[in-house]
């Protein structure tokens, strides 16, 4: 992969294996150093400044990538001019000092000439870079000046009617209808051209603006356009090298102590303020590795309990340490950069192993179409696609939580939605026991199952898709989040270790170079140490700047992933993460509360049914008792009696 230029000039070299050591560290870290990710979100500020007065006419900030942060800039012509033009004329008056001058200013056309690329004969700042006709590239004039190569276009906005808007409402003219703050009645709109969106804005660029008058000299003002990108400066460590001190063995399990009832303070004793809790210590290497394996076991045990009756989970000690599983998911669409994607990071990590089939976006080449179950094309427009919680976009330019459709439409970049899993292998007990037994015959190499194959799709499928259908789904999702937190902690510790090694190597190289200079002085008569050793090439190439940049970028990306993970956590899940006693209390009283609620809901109905049933049975018994005590009289038909008579 492509690497940036060396951060320092070439120096004398005493150790030719230095670059190889640095490359080994980079491979160990699993990071590849390239140019900035095109999907990286920055805080970009565009500033328009009057070069004659130094005042800022407009300062607009927005979040976005370096490809689509080119907004329309709105400001007033009088913000560029100030109180007076450089050479006021009688028909212009005092420029923008008075309402009449502001009103007369908007009656004139204007034209703009670039100062960043001055054509022959266009003059300098005194002429506003408009020394002759044909130098103008944009403006608002009857001949419609335009250009195909300039970076901006500047036109008038919606110019208000009447003289009211030219009066300043803040200095006693508020009673005048239409008065505005500052009396701004010459609105301008600055837009970036296609050439401006492709240009480099590393330094300010200058233009000259002139009012067009039929007679006399055209007044001039100069302005600059600057792009400022918020960036995080380098972190400078203070203290001992933490590489060795961080290699701690696994900590012993903490014995749980039952809380004791508080004792009342003795009479007359002064009230004691409890001290602040001790700061939490960062886990050592042993704890981090055990957390990864323990998180893998908990997630596997809740999803496939039959596989964890007796098994061995082994953490792979060589790279790659992580692998990706392509998944299908529903991403969120944002018109502006989300807050969890606004962390300024300039690096990218790559995955050397991606399996499965999932959601792909962009122009996927034929060599990688096997990873795509569904391929979506991005539509026109500028918006951002944020990956669901627990997933990340694996692009041809690196890993990123957010995608910019502007970048996808302008480049050949493509991305796959993946889950990130640690490289943990699953082995049956027979395989592990066989490694320690004495065998004369060996079976063929067994197939190693990794955690990604066993749990792939846990975020977007299976359990996570069934959230709300039962407690098992919630618990399993919780275990998956614990595993993701362990992965994040391990990556952060890996970044810190490599950064400390890089600084140690830099210190060592400085000592070696000092020794080299001393040897050159000793062998000065022979032409220096290189000539005395009869070596043709004796230079030291410092590659530590590459490692330093890579680690700074890795640290910032981890912060970005942490914010994305926290933003994707629901309120119900966060409720149980606040304190352990709250979780225990809820799980203890949840059962009785549910039973009590069911009794209150269905108890009255069941009781009424029971009372009605008892009443019916009692009425039947009463009827039987009355029937036995009385005899029914025989009914006589009157017709039959008459017939007898």
Swiss-Prot record:
Residues 34-585 are extracellular. A motif (CX6CC) lies at residues 530-538. Disulfide bonds join 113-130, 122-135, 311-314, 311-538, 341-395, 360-372, 402-415, 530-537. Residues 447-467 are annotated as: Fusion peptide. Glycans are attached at residues 43, 58, 301, 333, 340, 373, 409. The mature envelope protein (Env) consists of a trimer of SU-TM heterodimers attached by a labile interchain disulfide bond. The activated Env consists of SU monomers and TM trimers. This is Envelope glycoprotein. It comes from Xenotropic MuLV-related virus (isolate VP35) (XMRV).
């Amino acid at each position: 992969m492509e690497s940036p230029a060396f951060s320092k000039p070439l120096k004398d070299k005493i150790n030719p294996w230095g670059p190889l050591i640095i490359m080994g560290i980079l491979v160990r870290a699993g990071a590849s150093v390239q140019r900035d990710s095109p999907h990286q979100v920055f805080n970009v500020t565009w500033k328009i400044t009057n070069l004659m007065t130094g005042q800022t006419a407009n300062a607009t900030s927005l979040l976005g990538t370096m490809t689509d942060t080119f907004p329309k800039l709105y400001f007033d012509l009088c913000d560029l001019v100030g109180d007076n033009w450089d050479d006021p004329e009688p028909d212009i008056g005092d420029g923008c000092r008075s309402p009449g001058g502001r009103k007369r200013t908007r009656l004139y056309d204007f034209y703009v000439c670039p100062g960043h690329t001055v054509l022959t004969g266009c003059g300098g700042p005194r002429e506003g870079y408009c020394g002759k006709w044909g130098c103008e590239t944009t403006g608002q004039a009857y001949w419609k000046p335009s250009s195909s190569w300039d970076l901006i276009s500047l036109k008038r906005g919606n110019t208000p009617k009447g003289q009211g808007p030219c009066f300043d409402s803040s200095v006693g003219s508020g009673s005048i209808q239409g008065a505005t703050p500052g009396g701004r009645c010459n609105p301008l709109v600055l837009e970036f051209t296609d050439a401006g969106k492709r240009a480099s804005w590393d330094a300010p660029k200058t233009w000259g603006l002139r009012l067009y008058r039929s007679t006399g000299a055209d007044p001039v003002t100069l302005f600059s356009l600057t792009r400022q990108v918020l960036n995080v400066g380098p972190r400078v460590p203070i203290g001992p090298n933490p590489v060795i001190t961080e290699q701690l063995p696994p900590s012993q399990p903490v014995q749980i102590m039952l809380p004791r009832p508080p004792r009342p303070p003795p009479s007359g004793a002064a009230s004691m303020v409890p001290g602040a809790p001790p700061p939490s210590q960062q886990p050592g290497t042993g704890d981090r590795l055990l957390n990864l394996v323990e998180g893998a076991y908990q997630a596997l045990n809740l999803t496939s309990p039959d596989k964890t009756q007796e098994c061995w989970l082994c953490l792979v000690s060589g790279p790659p340490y992580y692998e990706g599983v392509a998944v299908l998911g529903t991403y969120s669409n944002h018109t502006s950069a989300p807050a969890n994607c606004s962390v300024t990071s300039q690096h990218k990590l790559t995955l050397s192993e991606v399996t499965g089939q999932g959601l792909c976006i962009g122009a996927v080449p034929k060599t990688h179409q096997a990873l795509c179950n569904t391929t979506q094309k991005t539509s026109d427009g500028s918006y951002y696609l944020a990956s669901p919680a627990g997933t990340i976009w694996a692009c041809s330019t690196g890993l990123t939580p957010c995608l910019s459709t502007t970048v996808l439409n302008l480049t050949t970049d493509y991305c796959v939605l993946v889950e990130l899993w640690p490289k943990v292998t699953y082995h049956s007990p027979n395989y592990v026991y066989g490694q320690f037994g004495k065998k004369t015959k060996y079976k063929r190499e067994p197939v190693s199952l990794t955690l990604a194959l066993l749990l792939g799709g846990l975020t977007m499928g299976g359990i996570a898709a069934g959230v709300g259908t039962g407690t098992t789904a919630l618990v399993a999702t919780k275990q998956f989040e614990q595993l993701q937190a362990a992965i994040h902690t391990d990556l952060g510790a890996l970044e810190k270790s490599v950064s400390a090694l890089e600084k140690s190597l830099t210190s060592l190289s400085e000592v070696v170079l000092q020794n080299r200079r001393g040897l050159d002085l000793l062998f000065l008569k022979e032409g220096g140490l290189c000539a005395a050793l009869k070596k043709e090439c004796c230079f030291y190439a410092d590659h530590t700047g590459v490692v330093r940049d890579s680690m700074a970028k890795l640290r910032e990306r981890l912060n970005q992933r942490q914010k994305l993970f926290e933003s994707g956590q629901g309120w119900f899940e966060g409720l149980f993460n606040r304190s352990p006693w709250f979780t225990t209390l809820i799980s203890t009283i949840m059962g009785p509360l549910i039973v009590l609620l069911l009794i209150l809901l269905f108890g009255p109905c069941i009781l009424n049914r029971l009372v009605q049933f008892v009443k019916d049975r009692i009425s039947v018994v009463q009827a039987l008792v009355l029937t036995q005590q009385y005899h029914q009289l025989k009914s006589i038909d009157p017709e039959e009696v008459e017939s007898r008579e």
